[in-house]
Each structure stands twice: as C-alpha cells, then as structure tokens.
Amino acid sequence: MSSPTLNRKIGGHVSIAGGLTNAVQNTLDIKGNCMQIFAGSPRMWLRTPFPEDQVTSFNLKVKEQDLSPIFIHALYLVNLASDNPELLEKSYQALLMDLQNGQRINSAGVIVHIGSHQGRGFDSVKDQIISLVKKLLKNTKDTPFLIENSAGQKGKIGSLEEIEALVKSIDDPRIKVCLDSAHMFEAGIDLREAKVVEDLVKKLGTKGLLDRLVCLHLNDSKTVLGSGHDKHENIGEGEIGKAGLSNLVNHPKLKHLPLLLEVPGQDKKGPDQKNIQTVHTLTN
C-alpha cells in the first residue's frame, strides 16, 4: 500500500554492536530508510578503522536496501573548546577516525557537539575550535563535518549565532549543520508556534545556515520550553508534541531533510518502529 510519506527519509540512531553490518538489520527492524550510528563505543575514546570486510558487506547491504543517507554521531566526550591539551588531542584523534571511517562508508557526515567553553566564553575559544576543525578537514577527505545545535546548557557551544560564527570563519563546503528539535525547544525556540518556525527558517537563511542544513534530529522534549536541559522524549509524548514537530518537518524549506530519531523508545531501547510510524503520520 502506497503512502504519501514513503519517500521521506526517516530513520533512527541504531547500534553497530556485533559488527557494522548489524546496523542495516537494526534499521530494517524499525522500518527506517536512513540511519545514524556511533563508529565505536559512545563513551570510550578508542576509535579504530572499520574492518575492511565489514565495510564491503555494509556498503553492499546499504545499497541493496537503499538505506541512505548514513550519518555518524561523534563521541559525547569530544570537546574542541577544552583548555586541557590531552583532552583536545583525544577529541581530535576521535574525530579524525570518525571522518576517515565515514568516508569509507560514504557517510553524509559526522555530527558533532562542539563542546563546552566551561565558563570562559565562546569568544575565548572560537579561534581554537576553528583551527582544529580546519586541521581535521585538511587531513580527511569527502565526509562532511556537521555542527549540531545545543540545548542552551550553560557553557555548551551550539547556539545559532555561535554556529554561524564557526561556519563563516571555517568557510569550507564540507561544514554542514544538524538541528535537533528537542535542543531548539529546550533553548527557547517554541516549535509549537508556526510563526516561530517560520521566523526560525528565515533566521537560518539570513545566517547562511539553511543551505548547509542537511538533517534534523527529530526528538520530542521531556523538559519545558527554554529549560536548558537536554532530555529527549518519544515523538508526541513530550512538551513539543505532534503539532509542534509537524510544524518543523513540514515547512516547505525543511521537508526534504532526512529525519533522525534519538528517542528513548517504548521499551527504553532507543528508536523503534512505533516512533517512526508516528513520524510518518506527521509528515505530508
């Protein structure tokens, strides 16, 4: 039976536990048609090249099932704004490997939380971030580097203004943007109001970010508008609600974007078929 949303790319963050190719079956199990993965443990610094046999098998299966685009989410430990040289080097090496692995699986990008300036202010760390990202791009090929917005937590870098400053200064076609619906709401952008979404899209255009926006993290928020706390909820079960998320995903200038879910899931095991089905009912 055909569906008007069949062509919309909707997927979720899936596990590669047991091997890279398992991400394909995990995506099919939740009825996704695109995916996001970690290229290793999300809470360990160690990053290694994907085994060649797994890469070959994965690429073949992805093509067979038409499961693209594929995004890699960087380590949560990464902090390009740190004043700790050891942490900076670990962050750089982890991102370097993610970008290299991304190129081997034709990834549409590595999604990165830039990190925290730990009270020192964005202006004091901006040049350091720019220098490190430029170095990463110089030493890798093809794979885009996606900056994700923050939820407005104290010290965390990722407001639209900060992303704009980084994008303009780095000035590289591989620099792209990922926006998270829960983070926007938690940072004070009320997606429940259609006019606010319209103003957001205009703002993205003015800041030169709309053309660099390549995907949306579609998550409901467990916390209230402007909370500054990053807590995701299942689609339609949080403070944003179905109507608010619908405002976002159906905006004419956003409706081509892949939607990646990072929700708890009905059984607390992550994105599931029910959440993806709910998103299909929101899209038109």
What is each of the regions a protein language model found here?
Residues 86-98, 122-135, 160-169, 196-202, ...:
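Short, electropositive alpha-helical surface patch
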Residues 36, 214-217, 256-263:
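Conserved active-site loop/cleft motifs that coordinate metal ions or position small ligands
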Residues 1-72, 78, 82-97:
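N-terminal pre-domain/capping segments
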Residues 5, 25-31, 51-71, 96-106, ...:
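Acidic (Asp/Glu)-rich catalytic clusters
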Residues 64, 80-177:
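Active-site acidic/histidine proton-transfer and metal-coordination neighborhood
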Residues 35, 133-233:
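Acidic/histidine-rich catalytic cores of soluble enzymes
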Residues 27, 73, 91, 102, ...:
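Conserved, mostly hydrophobic/aromatic
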